[in-house]
Every structure is written in C-alpha cells, then in structure tokens.
Swiss-Prot record:
InterPro entries: PSII_PsbZ, PSII_PsbZ_sf. HAMAP family: PSII_PsbZ. It is found in: Plastid, Chloroplast thylakoid membrane. This is Photosystem II reaction center protein Z. It is a multi-pass membrane protein. The gene is psbZ. GO terms for cellular component: chloroplast thylakoid membrane; photosystem II reaction center. The keyword Transmembrane applies. SUPFAM superfamilies: PsbZ-like (SSF161055). PSII is composed of 1 copy each of membrane proteins PsbA, PsbB, PsbC, PsbD, PsbE, PsbF, PsbH, PsbI, PsbJ, PsbK, PsbL, PsbM, PsbT, PsbY, PsbZ, Psb30/Ycf12, at least 3 peripheral proteins of the oxygen-evolving complex and a large number of cofactors. It forms dimeric complexes. Coiled coil: none annotated. May control the interaction of photosystem II (PSII) cores with the light-harvesting antenna, regulates electron flow through the 2 photosystem reaction centers. PSII is a light-driven water plastoquinone oxidoreductase, using light energy to abstract electrons from H(2)O, generating a proton gradient subsequently used for ATP formation.
C-alpha cells in the first residue's frame, strides 16, 4: 500500500508541475485556449482525481 501511495503522490507532483508550466503557456499562445481547452480540463480533472486518491490512500497509511 505504501508503494501505491508514493506513486500517487509522485503522479500528483508531476501533474501539478506540468499544469503550472503548461497552462500559462497555453493561455499565452495566440490560439491556445480554443485549441487546447480539452487538454487543460483533462489535466485539471486528473489533478482533482489524484488529490482525492492521495487523500484516500493516506487514510490507509496513517
């Protein structure tokens, strides 16, 4: 269970890093928002899911 928790935390950190870098780049590009809206929403949905997964796994660890 600890390995699953560590992988979930790593995935959350990696997704957070990608969103922090990627979303401003998408919004700054000339046609960024209209062409990459689905990718931004998918990344945000993945991030929210990972937050809940880490919280659930944390309740089993501690």
């Amino acid at each position: 269970m600890t390995i699953a928790f560590q992988l979930a935390v790593f995935a959350l950190i990696a997704t957070s890093f990608l969103l922090v870098i990627g979303v401003p780049v998408v919004l700054a590009s000339p046609d960024g928002w209209s062409s990459s809206k689905n990718a931004v929403f998918s990344g945000a949905s993945l991030w929210i899911g990972l937050v809940f997964l880490v919280g659930i796994l944390n309740s089993f660890i501690s």
